[in-house]
Amino acid sequence: MARIAGINVPDHKHAVIALTAIFGIGKTRSQIICAASGIAESTKLKDLDETQIEALRTEVATFTVEGDLRREVSMNIKRLMDLGCYRGLRHRRSLPVRGQRSKTNARTRKGPRKAIKK
């Protein structure tokens, strides 16, 4: 298994699909990375030599991925909560943030039903 951006990327998959194992890299961004490093998308990672894997590492390093991206997202949510804006309040109360109805749905966000005490 090749190690890119601190993640063991599966080497039995095609390069485009294998790069999506890294948090912050989807299919489109992995296609951009493969094109910039001169690697065919259909090539499997186990068939690449060390210089090509190093080229992938340098291309991935230009993006914000994994721990840095997770930290950035959580800091953005924390900032909204500290501001006290509507979105921050919805995050704080564990309710849907983007305008979905919450009277009957939103069970995933709200968690399991709480029993009503009589």
From Swiss-Prot:
Residues 94-118 are annotated as: Disordered. It comes from the Bacteria. GO terms for molecular function: rRNA binding; structural constituent of ribosome; tRNA binding. InterPro entries: Rbsml_uS13_C, Ribosomal_uS13, Ribosomal_uS13-like_H2TH, Ribosomal_uS13_bac-type, Ribosomal_uS13_CS. SUPFAM superfamilies: S13-like H2TH domain (SSF46946). NCBIfam families: uS13_bact (TIGR03631). Belongs to the universal ribosomal protein uS13 family. This is Small ribosomal subunit protein uS13. It comes from Psychromonas ingrahamii (strain DSM 17664 / CCUG 51855 / 37).
